[in-house]
From Swiss-Prot:
It is found in: Cytoplasm. GO terms for biological process: alanine biosynthetic process; pantothenate biosynthetic process. The modification Pyruvic acid (Ser) is found at residue 25. It comes from Kosmotoga olearia (strain ATCC BAA-1733 / DSM 21960 / TBF 19.5.1). Its cofactor is pyruvate. Coiled coil: none annotated. This is Aspartate 1-decarboxylase. Is synthesized initially as an inactive proenzyme, which is activated by self-cleavage at a specific serine bond to produce a beta-subunit with a hydroxyl group at its C-terminus and an alpha-subunit with a pyruvoyl group at its N-terminus. Catalyzes the pyruvoyl-dependent decarboxylation of aspartate to produce beta-alanine.
Length: 115
């Protein structure tokens, strides 16, 4: 049997920018993408801790080490700069393939917190 399971998440990231007139997506610091095993154009769910909004969008690679978490297009209406969000990626696994998700916790400046 195949199941849709959490593959990874970036936990409590801070929205640093938003651009309503962009074509859509979320821009994520490439360093965080690598740590969370999230690829450019991958589908992610974004959960806004401040207002409870949940939405899906795709990922654009941001400058590595910049700390950028930017909401683009329609998603820019769903959060404010400074809001904290959880960015979740999923994968389809069979029971033999599954491994626990990668969790990347970050500071208010979107710097990874070492385990």
């Amino acid at each position: 049997m195949f199941r849709i399971m959490q593959k990874s998440k970036i936990h409590r990231a801070t929205v640093t920018d938003k651009n309503l007139n962009y074509e859509g997506s979320i821009t994520i610091d490439y360093r965080l993408m690598k740590l969370a095993d999230i690829r450019e154009n991958e589908l992610v769910q974004v959960v806004n801790i401040n207002n409870g909004e949940r939405f899906e969008t795709y990922v654009i690679k941001g400058e590595e080490g910049s700390g950028v978490i930017a909401l683009n297009g329609a998603a820019a209406r769903l959060a404010e700069i400074g809001d904290r969000v959880i960015i979740i990626s999923y994968a389809i696994y069979n029971d033999d393939e599954y491994k626990p998700p990668k969790i990347v916790k970050v500071t208010e400046k979107n710097e990874p917190i070492e385990k």
